[in-house]
A protein has these predicted regions:
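Short, well-structured N-terminal submotif of metal-dependent ribonuclease cores
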Residues: 1-37, 46-64, 146
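Histidine- and aromatic-rich ligand-binding microenvironments
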Residues: 5-6, 37, 101-103, 124, ...
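Generic structural signal for small/hydrophobic residues in well-ordered secondary structure
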Residues: 6-7, 44, 82, 113
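A generic structural signal for short hydrophobic patches within well-formed alpha-helices
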Residues: 10, 41-44, 127-128
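Generic detector of contiguous secondary-structure segments
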Residues: 24-25, 60-80
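Short, hinge-like loop/turn segments at secondary-structure boundaries
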Residues: 51-55, 89-90, 137-141
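Active-site neighborhoods of divalent-metal-dependent phosphate/nucleic-acid chemistry enzymes
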Residues: 70-121
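Acidic, PIN/NYN-like endoribonuclease modules and their adjacent C-terminal/linker elements
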Residues: 110-148
Length: 148
């Protein structure tokens, strides 16, 4: 099983000592199968408000996964699937993507996870609505207790 963390989980890790400790314990068992999504990298970098935050993010998160060649990058197919997912949900639920911009990133993250066989670790309940349309992918709450 492979994993990637959603932005909300990594923000907690960066801000909260107990979340950082839980992440370290998780990585001690699963670092070899844990990836950083390029979608999450985008969101984290966009949220860095100071040069110090950006530097820390680059050194502590991005480079850690880049050096290990574990950055999950969505393909053109993942973008297409994400677009189809958003269109289906918009038609079913009566909303537009521009009214819910965070769902665009979430749809791309879900589609790329499915494409790569990666389980998403998240606290975001919006992913449950994707499961009704996007089959064959998994998301779990932090921190999964699975056997190696």
């Amino acid at each position: 099983m492979k994993f990637t963390c959603d932005t909300n989980v990594l923000v907690d890790v960066l801000r909260d000592a107990s979340a950082e400790e839980a992440f370290s314990v998780f990585l001690s068992r699963f670092s070899h199968v844990t990836y950083l999504s390029a979608v999450v990298m985008l969101e984290l970098r966009a949220g860095a408000r100071t040069p110090g935050q950006a530097r820390m993010l680059e050194q502590e998160v991005v480079q850690r996964f880049a050096r290990a060649n574990r950055v999950l990058t969505p393909s053109a197919d993942a973008f297409s699937v994400a677009g189809q997912l958003l269109a289906t949900l918009a038609n079913r639920e009566g909303w537009t993507a521009d009214a819910h911009p965070s769902l665009v990133h979430d749809a791309l993250l879900a589609a790329s996870c499915r494409e790569s066989g990666v389980t998403l670790i998240t606290r975001d309940r919006d992913f449950a609505r994707f499961k009704t349309v996007l089959r064959g992918w998994r998301f779990v709450a932090p921190w999964p207790q699975v056997s190696q």
